[in-house]
Regions:
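Class I S-adenosyl-L-methionine-dependent methyltransferase catalytic core
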Residues: 1-176
């Protein structure tokens, strides 16, 4: 209900599955792992929700000019959440995306991606009991904390984060 209250109809989820999208988010357009939303040259457009994979590592191939996700994390690899957030932020700054909500359960991102602190963030007081996208099961006890980052609509001027604060303050601490 919080995501819907903030964004309304979602135009894009660049990191999803058909099953999860049909069951929960109902974004108008999604990219699956096979579609490779991270590396697509098609601009991301519209109101966007993004919850990228938080495990494994991403490494950049100079030869291909693309990111590759894997479990090993060899070489100069990066946290997937950071790579996905950077793509989201780029599309938002280009005004392809009017507003976006990013969710991650990787706390390391708070340290290695300082640009997130330029946006309103919600750190919930309770851990999210996440639903596994393949099997639709939840763990009896949530295993990690998560946080939301809001890339706001710019047409609202100085009040751009007010709606986010109003909606998400019921979940936890808002940092602006």
């Amino acid at each position: 209900p919080y995501i819907d209250a903030l964004l309304g109809d979602i135009d894009l989820d660049p990191c999803s599955t058909h099953q999860a999208n049909n069951q929960f988010l109902r974004a108008k357009r999604i990219y699956t792992m096979e579609d490779d939303g991270l590396n697509t040259e098609i601009p991301w457009t519209g109101k966007t929700y993004l919850f990228p994979p938080t495990y494994g590592r991403c490494s950049f191939s100079q030869k291909r000019g693309t990111w590759k996700w894997n479990m090993s994390g060899l070489g100069r690899s990066r946290i997937p959440s950071v790579v996905w957030f950077n793509r989201l932020e780029k599309e938002w700054k280009l005004r392809n995306i009017p507003e976006a909500l990013f969710f991650s359960t990787n706390p390391e991102m708070m340290r290695v991606c300082p640009n997130i602190w330029g946006y309103p963030i919600c750190i919930p007081t309770k851990r999210a009991n996440l639903v596994n996208g393949r099997d639709f099961y939840t763990l009896p006890t949530p295993f990690t904390w998560g946080f939301f980052i809001y890339l706001p609509r710019l047409d609202l001027g100085f009040n751009q984060a007010d709606q986010f604060k109003e909606i998400f303050s019921h979940l936890g601490k808002i940092i602006c």
